[in-house]
């Protein structure tokens, strides 16, 4: 085999693996978050709106107005216009981005691994089943773009530093990749610490003074990008985190200690999803998730995993620098979405493990290279068989898993099968049933969700609103009352609550609740509340209605 073919063969192999795992999505619809973010979002349906996307939130205002991701929303706009709103182009872009990201991971790994180890890393990344939530979902384009940009940036940095030739054009290229990634999704902020981890592990030879001198221009550029990003984002959103915390964190008024304890309960599951996913789900919520109420023995395995990761990362730094860097990659990439620093809008989400999993496959590539170079022949054969089985199993699981993202009906049925004990699975399935007019199924699913976890005020508000629209005043009023007990300062749904009370003839309650709601309701509802108070006073005074 010529040298050119030897270089091309891994690229073709990896591209085919990535295609095999994603090509079946080409006929899928807009599913789950795709619908509010793309399909129902008029802001991404016209090219004339493109400039304004850089001053608007990612999620539409009616869905909370969270996030700031103008690059990916701009990309959605171009795709929508080009395909006249058809989903096939969005999924084609997903497929192409998935292939490009796999090749970028391989190219990045080649910067510090021989070709065989890098090929193993790229192949395992191509067939990793936990990636399906990203590759099968249109909104996963944000994760794909970030991983693509950051893998290229790390690979370029390591190559240029190894050659002792980090020039101005390299600084510009890496900074541009960072800026694009950061404007695509906020977790791209991990690039600077990732490069520092590379300096501490796979980049050898320079003393710390030399490193500071060489890296100063790059990190000054990073600082400028981050400050500019925070300034513009601050004009759009006031909250630094950018998203409302997960309902369990928010409505239970969970302390930081209990939030960390909850994540320690989740850490074994997260480690398994990254290293060897045996069970996948699009949602992880109570009671599938164990909520911490103070220190508990159940948190010890998660604590052990965290401590062991740090200890191994330090211990392997000299003996196995690539493995050490892989552990650092997992840690750094996962930290912003871990709920350990700040609460996020989820407890565990498979899409957030896409970029951290690069570190896991780098470790696997380092192990494969070590076995190829140092193990006995019998052990090498055994490892080759195990790798082949792992690739086949991963690809088969990935292809099978892609089916659940075909459309919303398929997705929500699969969600119930995957997370039968999760309250959000039943809540979301109830919402889907309501959209199709299946009211008996809707009520059954809503009641099941509330029995599992009644402290999600957003969910109980939604159910109360559904009851109101169906004319079921008594159960609606009961749920509104519960909702405002959980979230007493909420202004949403106050008028609907007062309306239900009026329908039930509870005029004393109408007057009390309308007056109590005045500090919380939006300005447009103040007049309605005052009218309700006046009507209650008239009825209670003996007037006819």
Q: Which residues fall in each region the model found?
A:
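Conserved structural position within tetratricopeptide repeats
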Residues: 417, 448-451, 481-485, 519
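Alpha-helical linker/edge segments of TPR/alpha-solenoid repeat scaffolds
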Residues: 471, 503-512, 534-545
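Extended amphipathic alpha-helical coiled-coil/heptad-repeat regions
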Residues: 530-532
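Alpha-helical, heptad-rich or low-complexity scaffold/stalk segments
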Residues: 496-499, 528
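Polytopic membrane enzymes that build or remodel cell-surface glycoconjugates and lipids
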Residues: 1-458, 465-469, 473, 496, ...
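Short coil turns that delineate tetratricopeptide repeat
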Residues: 420, 454, 488, 522-523
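TPR/TPR-like (Sel1-like) alpha-helical repeat modules
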Residues: 499-502, 507-524
